[in-house]
From Swiss-Prot:
GO cellular component, one term: cytoplasm
Molecular function in Gene Ontology: L-malate dehydrogenase (NAD+) activity
Family from the record: Belongs to the LDH/MDH superfamily. MDH type 1 family.
Name of the gene: mdh
Binding residues for NAD(+): G7, A8, A9, G10, G11, I12, G13, D34, N94, I117, T118, N119, M227
Alphabetical keyword list: NAD, Oxidoreductase, Tricarboxylic acid cycle
Name the record gives this protein: Malate dehydrogenase
Positions contributing to substrate binding: R81, R87, N119, R153
EC number: 1.1.1.37
InterPro entries, alphabetized: L-lactate/malate_DH, Lactate/malate_DH_C, Lactate/malate_DH_N, Lactate_DH/Glyco_Ohase_4_C, Malate_DH_AS, Malate_DH_type1, Malate_DH_type1_bac, NAD(P)-bd_dom_sf
Species of the source: Pseudoalteromonas atlantica (strain T6c / ATCC BAA-1087)
One biological process term in Gene Ontology: malate metabolic process
Residue runs in coiled coils: none
């Protein structure tokens, strides 16, 4: 199996690559690509870690080589958020980066599972879909927006609030991957009851957790380490599923639902990517209202991505 990370020299890319080097199954190839000249050094650095995962670095002229034969491609490339910016401010820069990388994926490994990490995910996944359609290789079962960070944050915050081990807490998070489009289903957390005030404050904190990190880093970056962990978790789940294990993860995929063209759902993963999009269950009144009020914004984010490629 071969996994490629595009944008491997950045904050998320390096954290993600480290976790994959230490956790991918023995015999996996890990291809690290970046336009930054440091990327061969990142690969050499990681190659000194004693695991049976072969790491190779590829510079800006070697994208095709990095992608050829890849089974999974992860894209964290792009510029990070700075204080005062929201994820939509990133669109102007990151949209073009994602478009170019996805075009190369279409040309060199069209069968690969493609995992989009670059923000704004609500929009960049739509860009990826349209770019793949334009090349005639779109398979909706193989395109994922990585929203796992919202899930691990929700599990951490609930665990901390109730003094539980977050590793044993399961919080469904549906919708999109920015602001109010992030919808944690706290009514479905097993064995834990919340007051209305707790639901409101937890929901707001989960939705604004990215900003919490950006502000805490005081201009020094965004959520790179936790995002690296979230992306690694999703990638490793996908690897396990491709090897025949039964795995469910929440991820932003194309759906046939009335909610939006793309929506984060619980998804059963398998050898060919999406095996089955599972229902997200019954919503509380609070969650139903929150969902209804954010759908227009989410649909607008998606439309922006579709129009970016087609206009």
């Amino acid at each position: 199996m071969k996994v490629a990370v595009l944008g491997a020299a950045g904050g998320i890319g390096q954290a993600l690559s480290l976790l994959l080097k230490t956790q991918l199954p023995a015999g996996t190839e890990l291809a690290l690509y970046d336009v930054a000249p440091v990327v061969p050094g990142v690969a050499v650095d990681l190659s000194h870690i004693p695991t049976d995962v072969k790491v190779e670095g590829f510079g800006k002229d070697d994208l095709a080589k990095a992608l050829t034969g890849s089974d999974i491609v992860l894209i964290p490339a792009g510029v990070p958020r700075k204080p005062g910016m929201d994820r939509s401010d990133l669109f102007n820069i990151n949209a073009g980066i994602v478009r170019n990388l996805v075009d190369s994926v279409a040309d060199n490994c069209p069968e690969a599972c493609l995992c989009i990490i670059t923000n704004p995910v609500n929009t960049t996944v739509a860009i990826a879909a349209e770019a793949l359609k334009a090349k005639g290789v779109y398979n909706k079962n193989k395109l994922f927006g990585v929203t796992t960070l919202d899930v691990i944050r929700a599990e951490t915050f609930v665990g901390n609030l109730r003094d539980l081990n977050p590793a044993n807490v399961h919080v469904p998070v549906i919708g999109g991957h920015s602001g109010t489009t992030i919808l944690p289903l706290l009514s479905q957390v097993e064995g834990v009851e919340f007051t209305d005030e707790e639901v409101a404050s937890l929901t707001t904190r989960i939705q604004n957790a990215g900003t919490e990190v950006v502000e805490a880093k005081a201009g020094g970056g965004s959520a790179t380490l936790s995002m690296g962990q979230a992306a690694a978790r999703f990638c490793l789940s996908l690897v396990s599923a491709m090897r025949g294990e039964n795995v469910v993860e929440y991820t932003y995929v194309e759906t046939n639902s009335d909610d939006a063209q793309f929506f984060s759902h619980p998804v059963r993963l398998g050898k060919n990517g999406v095996e089955e999009i599972l229902p997200y269950g019954e919503l509380s009144d609070f969650e139903q209202k929150a969902k209804e009020s954010m759908l227009e914004g989410l649909r607008g984010d998606i439309k922006l991505g579709v129009e970016f490629v087609n206009n």
